[in-house]
């Protein structure tokens, strides 16, 4: 008598696999969303890309944490096809799903990154602080920090606008009402002093 073999689901780490599947689905969705944004005829604002990238990074951290937390269970889990799996017609799919070795392209990429990392010197906190201070100073030199002009505009002789506060126009005794101050802070409306 040929009875179908019932799979034993007792030792399957369902919780670990489900949490991993959920995290992978989230990362896949975020990557697709980011790719769709980048392939639009006009790029979206950088803030939108930045937000999507931050979401993706958060999800990658969550995925990494899940893998680390479940690593013992996942390393001990062995997968195999059920007897009813069509191995003759789906041999390629089965080989891909059961693959233990990294794809050759991924292995080459990992080796390339390892080789590049060999030349990188890890900095101490003090060295990093010095480098950051130098980088900020270099960036500071690119701008005129006393107004709304770039270094290029200053070098080209563009004259900065002269801003005169309403009190200076009206004299020493001029006072602004609370409504005028709130209109300026909330809407940017310049107050007029009578």
From Swiss-Prot:
UniProt main location, coarse: nucleus
Originating organism: Yarrowia lipolytica (strain CLIB 122 / E 150) (Yeast)
Record protein name field: Mediator of RNA polymerase II transcription subunit 8
InterPro entries: Mediatior_Med8_fun/met
Localization: Nucleus
Keyword Nucleus: yes
Name of encoding gene: MED8
Quaternary state and interactors: Component of the Mediator complex.
Entry GO MF terms: RNA polymerase II cis-regulatory region sequence-specific DNA binding; transcription coregulator activity
Family to which this protein belongs: Belongs to the Mediator complex subunit 8 family.
Keyword Ubl conjugation set for record: no
One GO CC annotation: core mediator complex
GO biological process: regulation of transcription by RNA polymerase II
Function as written in the Swiss-Prot or TrEMBL entry: Component of the Mediator complex, a coactivator involved in the regulated transcription of nearly all RNA polymerase II-dependent genes. Mediator functions as a bridge to convey information from gene-specific regulatory proteins to the basal RNA polymerase II transcription machinery. Mediator is recruited to promoters by direct interactions with regulatory proteins and serves as a scaffold for the assembly of a functional preinitiation complex with RNA polymerase II and the general transcription factors.
Alphabetic keyword roster: Activator, Nucleus, Transcription, Transcription regulation
Pfam families reported for this sequence: Med8
